[in-house]
Amino acid sequence: MKKSLLYLILFVAANMVGGAVALLLSRWEHFAEGTEVSMDGLGNLPVSIGVAMFCTYVVLVLLMWVLKLIPRPLFPRTDKSPWHAEVSAMAAVAFLAFALSLLIAPLHLSDGGMTEQFDAMKDNVLCLLLLTVVGPLVEELVFRAGVLRSLLQSRWHPLAAILTTAALFAVVHANPMQALPALVSGSLFGVLYYRSGNLRLPLMAHILNNTLAVLSMHFPEMESHLEAWPVLWQLLLGFALLCVSFFLVAQWWKKTPQRMVKQ
């Protein structure tokens, strides 16, 4: 349990440091000239956040490696699931992402301005790498290979450990629009990690999930077209895709033997 808290503390601290560095980068000319720093006109702040968080996360991974908080080897050699089972798992992630988008859109939840921030990041290479690769890697190291693994080793019931980790994963996303999908997708990533005993599959799933989100930012007309549908149609299609996702996860589960999470 104490080790789980350590992972969370390091993650929160890294995000706080990254945010502070981003603010410094975005207003550097004011600090350098000794003039008053205004919070107005922070148009370059999202990109500064992306670059700062990219660098901070790289440092966090190195620190976790030095402190031996990352499993070694990171991807242990185990008998892989049949390729078609893993394809089912990845398809489940894609269907789940679309389902959650349809089911949550009618709620009109606040995202705290995150959509605008991500939209501003989409053309910066480091920001794209942060959103699609580095971010998922760090979050999987912290929440699945970190918190979830520690809870399982502490003899927590697997379901309780998976749901607790997913809830923490949702909380750190800080706004309802992101937190609800994070709770559901985080549960799926936890199931993939628990059953396979390997970070490889949940990491691939997380990267796919975030990549789909980034692609949706590049093609906003697709989302606008779906949101123009009647709410009932959105909900029906969302629930249908959700059922397909659950079915595919069940198929993967049946074809994947239980493996112990490495201590």
Language-model features: where?
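Functionally important transmembrane alpha-helices
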Residues: 12-16, 20-27, 178-233
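Juxtamembrane helix-loop-helix connectors linking adjacent transmembrane helices
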Residues: 31-46, 70-138, 149-154, 223, ...
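C-terminal membrane module of polytopic membrane proteins
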Residues: 40, 44, 207-263
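Active-site His/Glu-centered metal-binding helix of metallohydrolases
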Residues: 137-142, 146-147, 175, 188, ...
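Membrane-interface helix/loop boundary segments of multi-pass membrane proteins
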Residues: 138-164, 191-198
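Small-polar-interrupted transmembrane alpha-helices in polytopic inner-membrane proteins
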Residues: 158-173, 207
